[in-house]
């Protein structure tokens, strides 16, 4: 079988100021392409593509169907909490039964290629979401007796939020569908007004024995008008009139201009491949003029997080954008903050009854409003002024990496400065003077841990906010009348609570329980209010970090927790542990999927993106007005290089590491800011312009650079070339689903001899009807039983319909959440425990002396996360 497209080659070469960078981008990215040697069997493992607005995820669904699950980031309820809506999927229905298949995402061209073998022939295809048009293109060629039927399956239950429904809301009306000429369409009217339309057209463009079909599909959304169908039709007519060569050319041109904004290479195929898949993901999920990225991007499915979360999620979603020198993608976030500023002020009036504040709850709708659903029901737990301050820190990052003073001084256009003032204003009436004469905060929430007075989360954010406002007020001579108040707050604010284990959650609340969020260490990273370069600080941070990772055996330390830990270790200059934690993230198969997406029961894609930021932190840091070269590198990484990573102060930084040492650095100033650098050379080095270099002591140097000037620091030859690292015999194309490796996907069931197959089951609770008890005994790998959302305990019980002797139970678990369980049988009217344990894993067989019973119950006594779930629960004689 052959795929349709051959990969083109594009080169990027510079020769600026003794610099030579020659990268064959097509060949370099090719080694990071995710490859599926067997077809993914579910959404979470699928190949994905997107353009910052619409997206698709491709996987096999059933014996003869490939499903392109469709999403569009701005299709929302427009009522209540304004959550995302589900759209449905475009099906490639084949005449034959699928025997084998492969997929490859060609990163260089942002294109999915696939080949499928059936019992009637072969299909090869390519699919892409155009970089600049809201259009999915699929081209498919068939051989033999194979034929394709294209069908759009509209989502009948549009509501994507699996946790919080509003039964009293008027249902959305049924969708309508039809055909006009070559265009087929499905239109959905919303109960709240407006419509969205999925429309497509097909073209049998090759009548030869290799039959080629071409499909264009678009998604349009309008509110409050009903014009989406008209817009969808116009889009299809426009793109179908374009020569296909031009359509492909403009798509590739966008992506080939995008990748060379910066370059990173490390001598580890798994980590380098993961990084470049995140760079692909960023541009697939974000555009400067697109919607703000939530937890799902354009690839949504049923979820418990169908809104914007601001107590960690949006912050880490955008975290890799800045150092990667891809600031244009971050503009979608700036636009969200700027355009919704009045709503943030309205939130403060509603929550704190102040007119000059600005805030959110821990989650908002896509208008920045608190909404009328679960956020309000949870007050005061999720009414936390720190969440919005942390959200604004992201805006400040954009400013610091760009040094665009308009982001601060043009206050009519840009809301940052005034919103930060309002966010800090929300703390004013909360602060009280204690017996020690210090300012103290009341009981507030430390994200996901619990409540505590003077909690370190809010103390660190209040400090950062006041410090930042004073810095900007002084730099831009804003003469803000509130400046003395911020100074007094900083002067009087109580110290961070600590104990023998380091930073506490808050005053009187030690860190006693395993917990996935590093909210009590925000002052270390990303706020950098406390420097680990001071020995007394480093000691307390080391204690805190070790305690966080090990208390209760780290049972609640998740994949993204490890990515955060990697940042923290890199901040301390500990490259060995930074790498260890980054590997821990990548190897956490419970959460990190073969396609690099991150699933915690539902998609939370930001938890993969933050791992890209972790690698950047090992390579380059620039907090505290100091550029640090290779600050967190492990000894095993003898070589590494990067080109045009961006540092705070608007510097482009390139560097080469050879034989475990820094050998070459280039710094280019984009704004003429003061430049201080820790080059991390071993021994003496040379500057190509000595007059611009001044030693400050302790490995710190000042560089005198005007705007658009560059300087090179080096050992050996000044003319060194930035090239990809040699991966040696490492397995390239690490990511993607490999044959027989789907341990965390749909399980391979062996139910021969099951005594419980299809027998009636009951349960303590179910997540929804789609996850009821009988799904756990139906013998189908694609279905499962799940405890109700938020619950960590529950049971499932099988009625064997007569007393039967058995000595084994097989359990197939979804995502490995169960931490404690028991197995019971009913003896007359009494339940008797016959087995206990702590972990199930993907599959586990429990054996025990034979018992005779009609009823058998599996009890989940505790879980690492809510809604633990089993694919199957089966009883065997022996």
Regions found by a protein language model. Give the residues of each.
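Short, surface-exposed beta-strand/strand-loop-strand elements in extracellular ectodomains
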Residues: 817-829
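C-terminal beta-sandwich/jelly-roll accessory domains of carbohydrate-active enzymes
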Residues: 660-749, 841
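Disordered, acidic Ser/Thr/Pro-rich linker "stalks" and the adjacent N-terminal cap
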Residues: 526, 734-806, 812-820, 836, ...
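Short beta-strand-plus-loop segments that form exposed binding edges in beta-rich domains
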Residues: 859-866
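Active-site core of glycosidic bond-cleaving carbohydrate-active enzymes
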Residues: 310-346, 354-358, 380-402, 414, ...
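Acidic/histidine-rich catalytic neighborhood
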Residues: 422-472
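Catalytic cores of secreted or luminal carbohydrate-active enzymes
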Residues: 86-93, 605-654, 658
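Beta-sandwich/jelly-roll carbohydrate-recognition scaffolds of carbohydrate-active enzymes
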Residues: 20-270, 275-276, 289, 650, ...
């Amino acid at each position: 079988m052959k795929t349709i497209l051959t990969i083109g080659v594009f080169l990027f070469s510079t020769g600026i100021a003794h610099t030579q960078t020659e990268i064959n981008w097509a060949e370099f990215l090719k080694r990071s392409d995710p490859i599926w040697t067997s077809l993914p069997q579910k959404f979470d493992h699928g190949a994905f593509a997107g353009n910052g607005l619409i997206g698709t995820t491709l996987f096999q669904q059933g014996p003869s169907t490939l499903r392109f699950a469709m999403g569009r980031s701005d299709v929302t309820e427009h009522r209540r909490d304004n959550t995302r809506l589900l759209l449905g999927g475009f099906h490639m229905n084949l005449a034959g039964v699928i025997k084998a298949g492969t997929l490859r995402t060609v990163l260089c061209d942002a294109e999915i290629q696939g080949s499928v073998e059936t019992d009637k022939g072969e299909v090869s295809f390519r699919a892409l979401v155009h970089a600049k048009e809201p259009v999915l293109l699929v081209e498919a060629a068939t051989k033999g007796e194979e034929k394709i039927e294209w069908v759009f399956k509209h989502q009948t239950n549009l509501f994507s939020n699996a946790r919080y429904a509003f039964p009293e809301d008027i249902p959305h009306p049924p969708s309508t569908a039809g055909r006009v000429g070559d265009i087929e369409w499905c239109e959905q009217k919303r109960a709240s007004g407006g419509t969205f339309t999925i429309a497509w057209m097909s073209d049998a463009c090759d009548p030869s024995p290799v039959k080629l079909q071409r499909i264009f599909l678009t998604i349009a959304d309008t509110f409050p008008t009903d014009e989406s169908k008209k817009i969808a039709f116009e889009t299809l007519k426009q793109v179908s009139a374009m020569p296909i060569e031009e359509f492909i050319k403009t798509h590739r041109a966008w992506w080939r201009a995008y990748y060379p904004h910066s370059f990173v290479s490390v001598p580890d195929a798994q980590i380098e491949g993961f990084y470049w898949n995140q760079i692909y993901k960023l541009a697939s999920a974000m555009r400067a003029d697109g919607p703000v990225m939530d937890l799902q991007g354009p690839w949504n499915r049923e979820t418990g997080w169908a809104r914007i979360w601001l107590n960690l999620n949006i912050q880490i979603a955008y975290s890799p954008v800045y150092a990667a020198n891809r600031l244009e993608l971050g503009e979608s976030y700036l636009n969200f903050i700027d355009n919704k500023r009045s709503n943030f002020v309205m939130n403060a009036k509603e929550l704190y009854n102040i007119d000059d504040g600005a805030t959110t709850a821990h989650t908002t709708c896509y208008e920045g409003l608190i909404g009328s659903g679960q956020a309000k029901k949870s007050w005061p737990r999720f009414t936390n002024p720190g969440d919005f301050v942390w959200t604004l820190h992201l805006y400040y990052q954009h400013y610091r990496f760009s040094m665009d003073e308009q982001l601060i001084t043009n206050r009519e256009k840009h809301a940052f400065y005034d919103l930060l003032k309002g966010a800090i204003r929300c703390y004013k009436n909360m602060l009280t003077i204690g017996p020690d004469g210090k300012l103290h905060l009341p009981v507030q929430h430390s994200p996901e841990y619990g409540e505590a007075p003077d909690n370190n989360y809010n103390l660190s954010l209040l400090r950062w906010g006041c410090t930042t406002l004073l810095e900007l007020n002084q730099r831009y001579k804003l003469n803000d009348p509130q400046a003395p108040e911020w100074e007094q707050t900083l002067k009087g604010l109580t110290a961070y609570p600590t104990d023998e284990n380091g930073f506490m959650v808050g005053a009187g609340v030690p860190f006693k329980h395993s917990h996935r969020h590093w909210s009590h260490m925000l002052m270390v990273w990303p706020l950098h209010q406390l420097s680990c370069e001071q020995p007394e600080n480093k000691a307390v941070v080391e204690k805190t970090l070790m305690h966080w990772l090990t208390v209760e055996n780290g049972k609640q330390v998740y994949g993204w927790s490890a990515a955060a830990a990697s940042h923290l270790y890199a901040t301390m200059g500990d490259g060995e542990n930074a790498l260890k934690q980054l590997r821990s993230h990548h190897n956490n198969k419970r959460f990190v999927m073969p396609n690099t997406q991150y699933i915690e029961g539902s998609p939370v894609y930001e938890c993969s993106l933050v791992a890209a930021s972790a690698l950047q932190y090992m390579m380059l840091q620039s907090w505290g007005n100091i550029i640090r070269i290779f600050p967190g590198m492990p000894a095993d990484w003898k070589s590494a290089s990067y080109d045009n990573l961006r540092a705070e102060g608007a510097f482009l930084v390139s560097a080469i590491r050879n034989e475990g040492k820094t050998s070459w650095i280039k710094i280019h100033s984009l704004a003429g800011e003061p430049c201080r650098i820790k080059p991390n050379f071993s021994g003496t080095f040379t500057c190509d312009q000595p007059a611009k270099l001044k030693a400050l002591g302790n490995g710190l140097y000042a560089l005198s650079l005007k705007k658009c000037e560059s300087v090179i620091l080096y050992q050996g030859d000044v003319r060194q070339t930035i090239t990809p690292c040699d991966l040696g015999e490492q397995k390239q194309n690490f990511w993607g689903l490999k044959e027989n490796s789907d341990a965390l996907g749909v399980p391979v069931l062996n139910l021969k001899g099951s005594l419980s197959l299809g027998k009636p089951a009951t349960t303590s609770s179910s997540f929804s009807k789609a996850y009821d008890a009988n799904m756990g005994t139906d013998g189908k790998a694609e279905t499962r039983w799940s405890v109700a959302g938020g619950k960590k305990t529950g049971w499932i019980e099988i009625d064997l319909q007569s007393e039967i002797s058995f000595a084994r139970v097989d359990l197939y678990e979804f995502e490995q959440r169960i931490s404690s369980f028991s197995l019971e049988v009913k003896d007359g009217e009494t339940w008797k425990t016959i087995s206990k344990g702590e972990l199930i894993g993907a599959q586990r067989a429990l054996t025990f002396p034979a018992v005779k019973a009609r009823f058998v119950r599996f009890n989940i006594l505790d879980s690492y996360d809510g809604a633990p779930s089993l694919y199957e629960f089966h009883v065997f004689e022996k």
